Amino acid sequence: MENKTQFELESRRFVLGGAVVALVLIFILRLFFLQVVESDYKAWADSNAFLKKTLYPSRGMMYDRTGRLLVYNQPAYDVMLVMREIQPFDTLDFCQILGITKEQFVKRIADIKNRKLNPGYSSYVPQLFMNQLSAQECGVLQEKLYKFPGFYIQNRTIRQYEYPNAALVLGNIGEVNRKDIENDPYYTQGDYSGRTGIEQSYETYLRGVKGVEILLRDAHGRIKGRYEEGKHDVPPESGKSLKLSIDMELQAYGEKLMKNKLGGIVMIEPETGEILCMVSSPTYDPSILIGRQRGKNYAALQKDPLKPLFNRPLMAQYPPGSTFKPTQGLIFLQEGVITPETTYTCAHGYTYRGGKPACHGHPSPLPLVGALATSCNSFFPWGLHDMIDSRKRYPTVQEAFDVWKEHLVSMGYGYKLGVDLPGEKRGFVPNSKFYDKF
């Protein structure tokens, strides 16, 4: 009797478990149907009835502080395709018009279908086949486009530069990658975004908002015209233009001074902190990173041993030189190491224990104001020497160094300035442990 009851309980458990599994499977199948089958069917039905054509906005322009136009747009044309609409055609003729080989054609089609490279791929949705055709190339293709079903021309704009200067400040734009598409739903395969400089920092301001034009198809898939006379179209919104703090005349002059040299020049308006010019040398003409040769030219810049893509004012760490002297003087005064009347002798440089900083000839000895006026290379090393070696003020050398560093940090040394350009590196302020290594 007990065995029979146990058997019935086990049977009920089995039936109940089977029912639960069945319900879960039904739920999963329903989700699959709703998310995959129905969405694909809807995309198929929509693509049969309509062509939703993206309208790309004009990117915002850039001006310098005086109102000079620096960056603007010019028309360009992309070749788009809807994969399911492609029918047999003369690929040789098509390739000759676009100046590509048949092998390149086949590879482009394969890359479009590759969801690893193109996560947003759908045979119902327009895909980028070739970008940035010139007006002449577009005209030739437009005349024969009827021979190539599934392909159409997409109007775009590309950047143009009024001056061959400030490449690393202005930045450049390039095609978005998979990560960009996954992180921002605004982008689709073939879109462009700012990759460096101001173009990157102000991408969301400059790019604008896309629009859409809905075109009606007939039963054969041919475009009949705008759906309901454009009632449902959404016009694009142009990007916002920017007025920079840069003075292009100063920028160009700085680049001229730095030609065939390694280094940088930064000019700052003291009252506002605005950057008037930021020169990095060597540099390059920003116009070489537009058009279909962008990839080739960018690769050449990357391989250049002089590193023209390296923004030295932002990324390199250089000794501050004589610009550091006023800071040193303030620290010495604050700590009571010197007074405004304290003088140091300059024997054409700081030679204590083999010191290296040489100095030009000037009256000696000098107080602080005179040392700043003549940029003396002896006064400030002697001041630091007296501060570090003063056991009356600081019990140890280490404590003296730490106090010195605290003053520097309090004035902003060792921090990023927070300029609106990507890639900035912070400065290095040594402490006593750093000098213990020597």
Residue ranges and their predicted role:
Residues 1-293, 317, 400-410:
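Periplasmic/cell-envelope proteins involved in peptidoglycan metabolism and beta-lactam response
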Residues 7, 71, 218-223, 227-233, ...:
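Beta-lactam-recognizing serine transpeptidase/beta-lactamase-like catalytic domain environment
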